[in-house]
Swiss-Prot record:
Protein name, UniProt field: ATP synthase subunit alpha
Gene Ontology terms, MF aspect: ADP binding; ATP binding; proton-transporting ATP synthase activity, rotational mechanism
GO cellular-component term (any): plasma membrane
One matching Pfam family: ATP-synt_ab_C
Organism: Polynucleobacter asymbioticus (strain DSM 18221 / CIP 109841 / QLW-P1DMWA-1) (Polynucleobacter necessarius subsp. asymbioticus)
Membrane topology of this protein: Peripheral membrane protein
Lineage start: Bacteria, Pseudomonadati, Pseudomonadota, Betaproteobacteria, Burkholderiales
Binding site for ATP: G169, D170, R171, Q172, T173, G174, K175, T176
């Protein structure tokens, strides 16, 4: 039998064409070691900083250290099944999380996956968790208020939309309570909220979610939870994930408020990752870039101008500015605000609210130290009526604290000093407020007007809060039109001032104090 060479070549060609081999080019490496959620991978020559890596069983990792002959990656989630010699693939993608209004009312983890047992979240968009903050030209000055509903804050350290206001204090001084009250008070004000819980007990997070649900605040809130049982990587990333979810609203001409509770635990998680990656430690064993860790996060909170919003939405939204207001929380040790992380965050933010253990234990809650709490930009954003009436409050309180220290040693005080001490005691009492009971603008205005004009001076200190509550009920029932006007205009005209004075005097005559 004679074979024709051309037939043989045709036969080989047809067999090759029928094989249908699908070739794939990919960058692949091998796991060298696994320790505490950190994998060292050999290979992956074309990997990017911050790129997502694919480990066996669909486990995701993040490339953080790019070295000469290996890559240091942190595993997001369970890592006990990963072993030496396992293959690792590059995905060519930077870490993203789902964003959009579909997340409102839900509890998610640092990767945007639901953990509240209410089923999947069908978001239409995803966005990068690490983004560059808006530039100088894209920003607009802070000029609109964020009402927290807390007298002590709205009167003395006002917060504006787009501001970063630090809440700092020892453990158990009511830091979370202040932030949660601020979220509750945004109901009906068109501000979307994001609450990021970092390294907290799962029971504490559950309590916050339950309270927000009870008070109807979950409708406009996303909770990003990375509890103490989660890996250090998830705690480190949760703040950036929450920020991206808040930026979705900012970039579309809406207003958003984000609470980071707390950034001390995020810094500790980042320190753990850095030390395991063998990065050189610096002060307090933190890595050299711990300042950048927080600055790049907090700089993303800003008020952006209408041109930025219009450009971002391709002309779909016109004439609206967007804002992301940040309330980072820092926990101090024995009131030491000069430690590394507290000083870093104080220098990044636009002001701070100091909460003190002594005041908290003395029953002054919220336990705000008026002397050293400041708001560097909020004054321009303060509600008109509160700005008019709150000028004397801060001075009265600061002077009272100083005089009270001297008064302990002095036996005979002159009349002016005694009056100032008495006024200070009443102002301190008035600044007390129950948790989950934020006040409306008109309620705050009535209280501030009454204390400024001496209507509390002849009351006993213990009756101040009862008088305030009675006055609010009296105004609501008999002066509803005045209340509505103050609430609508957020200002106090001469006629309204006269009406308010008459209303307070009328109540004082009838009240039994």
């Amino acid at each position: 039998m004679q074979l024709n060479p051309s037939e043989i070549s045709e036969l080989i060609k047809s067999r090759i064409s029928e094989m249908g081999v699908d070739s794939q080019v990919r960058n692949e490496g091998t796991v060298i070691s696994v320790t505490d959620g950190i994998c060292r991978v050999h290979g992956l020559s074309g990997v990017m900083q911050g790129e997502m890596l694919e480990f066996p069983n669909n486990t995701i990792g993040l490339a953080l250290n790019l070295e000469r002959d290996s890559v240091g990656a942190v595993v997001l989630g369970e890592y006990t099944h990963i072993k030496e010699g396992d293959p690792v693939k590059c995905t060519g993608r930077i870490l993203e999380v789902p964003v959009g209004p579909e997340l409102l009312g839900r509890v998610v983890n640092a990767l945007g996956q639901p953990i509240d047992g209410k089923g999947p979240i069908n978001t239409k968009l995803t966005d990068f968790i690490e983004k560059v903050a808006p530039g100088v030209i894209a920003r607009q000055s802070v000029s609109q208020p964020v009402q927290t509903g807390l007298k002590a804050i709205d009167a003395m350290v006002p917060i504006g939309r787009g501001q970063r206001e630090l809440i700092i204090g020892d453990r158990q001084t009511g830091k979370t309570a202040v932030a949660v009250d601020a979220i509750i008070n945004q109901k009906g004000k068109g501000v979307y909220c994001v609450y990021v819980a970092i390294g907290q007990k799962a029971s504490t997070i559950a309590n916050v979610v339950r309270k927000l649900t009870e008070l109807g605040a979950m409708e406009y809130t996303v909770v990003v939870a990375a509890s103490a049982s989660e890996s250090a990587a998830m705690q480190y990333l949760s703040a950036y994930a929450g920020c991206t979810m808040g930026e979705y609203f900012r970039d579309r001409g809406e207003d958003a408020l984000i609470v980071y509770d707390d950034l001390t635990k995020q810094a500790v998680a980042y320190r753990q990752i850095s030390l395991l990656l063998r990065r050189p430690p610096g002060r307090e064993a933190y890595p050299g870039d711990v300042f950048y860790l927080h600055s790049r996060l907090l700089e993303r909170a800003a008020r952006v101008n209408a041109e930025y919003v219009e450009k971002f939405t391709n002309g779909a939204v016109k004439g609206k500015t967007g804002s992301l207001t940040a309330l980072p929380i820092i926990e101090t040790q024995a009131g030491d605000v000069s430690a590394f992380v507290p000083t870093n965050v104080i220098s990044i933010t636009d002001g701070q609210i100091f909460l003190e253990t002594d005041l908290f234990n003395a029953g002054v809650r919220p336990a705000i130290n008026a002397g050293i709490s400041v708001s560097r930009v909020g004054g321009a954003a303060q509600t008109k009526v509160i700005k008019k009436l709150s000028g004397g409050i801060r001075t009265d309180l600061a002077q009272y604290r100083e005089l009270a220290a001297f008064a302990q040693f002095a036996s005979d005080l002159d009349e002016a000093t005694r009056k100032q001490l008495e006024r200070g005691r009443r102002v301190t009492e008035l600044c007390k407020q129950a948790q989950y009971k934020p006040l409306q603008v008109w309620e705050m205005a009535a209280s501030l007007y009454a204390v400024n004009n001496g209507y509390f001076d002849d009351l006993e200190v213990k009756n101040v809060l009862a008088f305030e509550k009675g006055l609010q009920d009296h105004l609501k029932s008999k002066y509803a039109d005045l209340v509505a006007r103050i609430e609508e205009t957020k200002d106090l005209s001469k006629d309204d001032e006269a009406a308010l004075r008459a209303a307070i005097e009328d109540y004082k005559r009838s009240a039994s104090f």
